[in-house]
Amino acid sequence: MSRKGPRAEVCADCSAPDPGWASISRGVLVCDECCSVHRSLGRHISIVKHLRHSAWPPTLLQMVHTLASNGANSIWEHSLLDPAQVQSGRRKANPQDKVHPIKSEFIRAKYQMLAFVHKLPCRDDDGVTAKDLSKQLHSSVRTGNLETCLRLLSLGAQANFFHPEKGTTPLHVAAKAGQTLQAELLVVYGADPGSPDVNGRTPIDYARQAGHHELAERLVECQYELTDRLAFYLCGRKPDHKNGHYIIPQMADRSRQKCMSQSLDLSELAKAAKKKLQALSNRLFEELAMDVYDEVDRRENDAVWLATQNHSTLVTERSAVPFLPVNPEYSATRNQGRQKLARFNAREFATLIIDILSEAKRRQQGKSLSSPTDNLELSARNQSDLDDQHDYDSVASDEDTDQEPLPSAGATRNNRARSMDSSDLSDGAVTLQEYLELKKALATSEAKVQQLMKVNSSLSDELRKLQREIHKLQAENLQLRQPPGPVPVPSLPSERAEHTLMGPGGSTHRRDRQAFSMYEPGSALKPFGGAPGDELATRLQPFHSTELEDDAIYSVHVPAGLYRIRKGVSASSVTFTPSSPLLSSSQEGSRHASKLSRHGSGAESDYENTQSGEPLLGLEGKRFLELSKEDELHAELESLDGDPDPGLPSTEDVILKTEQVTKNIQELLRAAQEFKHDSFVPCSEKIHLAVTEMASLFPKRPALEPVRSSLRLLNASAYRLQSECRKTVPPEPGAPVDFQLLTQQVIQCAYDIAKAAKQLVTITTREKKQ
């Protein structure tokens, strides 16, 4: 079949002309350089095949060209094509760009992170959404609109979805309608050609009954694709599926004995490995067969890659794929076993493939083993599998999912969403060195677990201390807000304590979101003031040990899951000049701490956690000094100096402006919690406006030094917040942005603003009472 389409073909990722590779699962054509990145992602992300030098079923190649020519690439680049999204700074790679890091980062974002795919407007219930999408897919496959079905699959529709009302899967519908290309696409995404409908009929039966005999034969080939691909890799032949479904090249190799590299490995280790292979449960055997299938695909693509590339320019260490990439859906043990397959030489790998083909045929036909395995020394996992099953040689029933016959290759190629147990492929020959390495790694892991448990306990104690301190400070703040006179101090904060700022807890019903790395993903966010300390402590996950040395964890009366911040810079590590206004405000604020205590506050301010002599902006002191050098901020801070003005605004006005600042901070923190980084800039502008209005209540040259220090901190923090939020838009298109670090910096700025505003409320309230 000709690979030329109706228009000039270009690479879907960088627009290079004359692409030589195809991504089957994405429906796009890619050039050699971009293909190297696709291969490094793994088959679970992109299944690649050379357009000219690889063997193609005609209908599969037609399906890929149909998708590519009908704009399937726009599915994966939806937001890049939207003019409203151009301001994000992301751009498509060019042919002249370097593979690393420009092309590789773009391709990873496009296919692995799905950063440019159209997002549904409402995803509150992912289960309902996936079900609705799957029903749409069930209806769409009867038509010839391939790109619509690919779009539904990209949004989360399930190719093996069983319609509860109609009792069929999408592949049944496509087979009945004779939609061969739709069937190819569904099989690529994991549809099983052997899955029965409510009456026990398969898609193959539907195609034959409707008179689509070529489609029925193609579905049979898809059903046995795994064993067909393994046999073709060894001998270049496939069964016709009319006279038989299996070709075992074992007999030909034994009789001919062409050379040592082509003969079977008949060592004792190989024989023992074959016995262990026969003793595997059907599920573990299926996993092993899928892993070997992926390794065959890698080796075939490697051979094509080496035969087609310019070795002086393209074949480098960074473009090679020496072993199977890690699949995050698999366990670490299984991923290690998959990668060890690359260490098999040609003879060992051929022996393994022949053993798998023989075992697959035996299990499919229900034949018994030729030799008993009672005396084998099996691992504990394999022995437990044996205890749970009657006989490996029996034909499985429909009800027993673990003892079903070897599933169709269409399902085993890509239907990887099920939870998998580990399957160590090195069980056949475990050397002493591997045993010692595993033992050492286990001891190291146990020591690390013990250390993390101690750290977790320490963090839990610290959390409870902070909880008690916050309750105490809230009670004091409530007391300060009461009219003069004896007022009993409540044991718990009231609802009016929300004026202590930073209270995103006002939003009581909020969907769980993924928190930062120090907490469990998806843990519910609750305010400190309303959640018991023990409950919050149980959610804590320990830091890595290297992150805990001399680091203090502190809280700002905010949800524990999001607004915990580490002090990473101490006072001794920041250099301040004597003339720095920020340093002077810090020192003056520290000197005034004793005055505040003599006025009868009874405790420190709600947000006061700086030490004597330590800058108020200790966490990012250097960044504040750099920011203070800006002319606008310098002029703002200098305006606080001069002849003193003893006047102070009313407490009600200060509280009113403080509430406005608090409201805007809550909006910013909600955006941070929901990872809406594009909302940072407008939120910071609102906060800056509210801070400006609050600062305008006070005289330009206040007489009280605490007021001047707090105003300095308030203005400086607002300017710094704007500066940090602007970093969400990179200065250069495509520049990487560390959003986790940036979010922590933004939260720190919000904390400093809240701290300064709280100090102004406290000072104004106290001065008005005197």
UniProtKB/Swiss-Prot annotation:
Region feature Interaction with PXN and TGFB1I1, mapped onto this chain: 646-770
GO cellular component: calyx of Held; centrosome; cytosol; dendrite; endosome; excitatory synapse; focal adhesion; GABA-ergic synapse
Record's compositionally biased regions (Acidic residues): 394-403
Residues bearing the modification Phosphoserine: 368, 371, 379, 384, 394, 397, 419, 422, 426, 507, 545, 570, 580, 601, 605, 639
Location(s), subcellular: Cytoplasm; Synapse; Presynapse; Postsynapse
Chain spans, region Interaction with PTK2/FAK1: 253-424
Interaction with ARHGEF7 as annotated region, ranges: 254-376
Protein name stated in the entry: ARF GTPase-activating protein GIT1
Protein source organism: Rattus norvegicus (Rat)
